[in-house]
A protein has these predicted regions:
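OB-fold single-stranded nucleic acid-binding module
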Residues: 139-144, 246-279
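Flexible helix-coil linker/hinge segments at domain or subdomain boundaries
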Residues: 151-161
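Hydrophobic helix-and-loop "lid/oligomerization" segment in the mid-to-C-terminal part
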Residues: 1-145, 159, 166-171, 213
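Short acidic/polar mixed-charge low-complexity motifs
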Residues: 96, 227-230, 264
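Short, acidic/hydrophobic/Gly-rich beta-strand patch recurrent on exposed beta strands
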Residues: 63, 221-226, 234, 269-272
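Noncatalytic, beta-rich nucleic-acid-contacting surfaces in large DNA/RNA-processing enzymes
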Residues: 97-101, 209, 266-274
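Beta-strand/loop nucleic-acid-binding surfaces
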Residues: 228-244
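Accessory interdomain/linker segments of ATP-dependent helicases and helicase-like nucleic-acid enzymes
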Residues: 171-231
Length: 279
């Protein structure tokens, strides 16, 4: 959060601080900054969703606003992509210059879309799944048309299928999941573009408990059963269709996370995709 809203030096100062009392104050300041970032991020996402509705028929969503902080537009773009299941550019406006962050998937390359608009932008680049762009504010509408024309020129098929997370391991039940497995997977870090985190899928798991968390019940914790074992899974800012009912069967694609509390370690699932079956 320090790097997104101000400077990453604040986090570095905390790590280097030797005085415990000063370190505590610096940690508190960072925590306050993180809360501020979450508030700004949430407000920006709400505005972006409203603006996206005006362009809901576009193949590529391009939303812009003067209130967007360019430190969090990438996070907002990820939120829009998850909600609308389309490539997204979120643009912050500051006077005559605008800065955008893109998130994409499948065969639509965000960086190629930016390069295709080279005549109307100031600069830009990135990779297939994410890119950045700087352009004159007056050219935002032209940029929106350019990236949508580029999408149409590709004549893409089955894009939505490519939005689904890849599955590395198909599970019959939860028996292979353990802290030891999580620790072995952790040796493969850092994960990112070109080194994806391993994913798992289980089908027809039964929901035996559901907990909604957060100030707006936007976070979800499910306890699933394979018939013999139980396994908890989490999804922050979960889509509405992920909130399965008790006794409902679900297919879930997930990665692994570790929950440490009072010296106890427990593996939990991080939900990437959930498909509800029938009650």
């Amino acid at each position: 959060s320090a790097g997104r809203l101000e400077t990453a030096e604040k986090a570095l100062d905390l790590m280097l601080e030797k005085d415990s009392f000063v370190a505590f104050e610096k940690a508190k300041n960072l925590d306050d900054l993180n809360k501020k970032r979450r508030k700004i991020q949430h407000e920006a996402l709400e505005i972006a969703i409203q603006k996206a509705e005006d362009f809901k028929n576009d193949k590529v969503l391009v939303v812009a606003d003067e209130s967007f902080n360019d430190g969090i537009i990438g996070i907002v773009a990820s939120g829009l992509l998850e909600r609308f299941k389309k490539p997204v550019f979120v643009i912050s406006i500051e006077g005559d210059v605008a800065k955008g962050s893109a998130r994409s998937f499948g065969d639509f390359s965000a960086s190629q879309a930016v390069q295709n608009a080279s005549e109307i932008i100031i600069k830009g680049g990135g990779h297939d799944a994410a890119a950045g762009v700087t352009l004159p504010t007056s050219k935002i509408d032209d940029f929106r048309k350019s990236v949508n024309d580029f999408y149409d020129s590709l004549k893409l098929k089955n894009q939505l299928e490519k939005l689904l997370p890849k599955v590395d391991i198909q599970l019959e039940d939860f028996s292979p999941i353990s802290v030891e497995l999580f620790e072995k997977i952790s040796l493969l870090e850092p994960f990112g573009n070109g080194n994806d985190e391993p994913t798992f899928e289980i089908k027809n798991a039964c929901v035996i408990a559901r907990q909604e968390m957060g100030d707006k019940n936007q976070h979800l914790k499910l306890t699933l059963s394979d018939g013999e074992r139980e396994f908890k899974m989490l999804k922050f800012n979960a889509p509405k269709d992920f909130f399965a009912e008790i006794d409902e069967k679900v297919d879930v694609i997930f990665s692994l996370g570790l929950n440490e509390w009072q010296g106890q370690k427990n593996v939990e699932g991080q939900i990437l995709h959930l498909e509800r079956k029938c009650v």
